[in-house]
Design a protein with these regions (language model features):
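A penicillin-recognizing enzyme superfamily signal
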Residues: 1-166, 170, 174
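Short, solvent-exposed mixed-charge patches
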Residues: 176-178
């Protein structure tokens, strides 16, 4: 989950912490957490990755006020299912599985991360968004950086071919559609 904080935070990794502050009985703050942060990836590259991960979560986006992105995961033999999802303000990682080898699902439709772990992410984020006491920023979106971006449309990077030289011709994905 720590690595995904970079995607949610414009390329800056934030080390997770659990206690944000401690007050004494009189309300004086005796401890306040200072998040440990480090630049991990260029902002423009980070946005491209986030844009791809938004596509993974597209099927559930309509359930949320904030933009979301995420990634599913499934281990061999459908023993573990993962979903790590995030908004610009929070990263949530969910896991469903067993600690014994014999505890597993028998088929991919039942045992994939999108089926067994993602629903927990969905329920938790819906609760967080609906709880006004948490101060969670509703309707938050991933901001596109102002710097020059690389194109996500791969067709812009296709190499041109020399028609007379058969060896140099490059097959395109559409050539394999037959």
């Amino acid at each position: 989950a720590c690595a995904y904080t970079a995607f949610a935070n414009e390329g800056i990794v934030t080390r997770p912490f659990f206690v944000t502050r401690i007050e004494d009985k009189n309300g004086r703050v005796i401890y306040s957490a200072v998040p440990e942060q480090k630049k991990a990836i260029n902002t423009a590259y980070n946005y491209v990755i986030v844009d791809m991960l938004k596509y993974v979560a597209k099927v559930i986006q309509g359930k949320f006020k904030s933009q979301i992105a995420g990634k599913t995961g499934t281990t061999n033999d459908y023993k573990d299912g993962w979903f790590i999802g995030f908004t610009p303000e929070i990263v949530i990682s969910t896991w469903v599985g067993g600690d014994q080898e014999f505890i597993r699902f028998n088929t991919l439709p039942d045992g994939q991360g999108a089926v067994m772990a993602r629903p927990f992410f969905e329920k938790l984020l819906q609760k967080i968004e609906s709880d006004n006491l948490l101060g969670f920023g509703k309707n938050s979106v991933f901001m596109k950086p102002e710097e020059e971006m690389i194109e996500i449309d791969c067709s812009k990077y296709e190499t041109t071919t020399i028609e007379n030289n058969e060896e140099d011709k490059i097959k395109k994905s559409s050539d394999f559609d037959e």
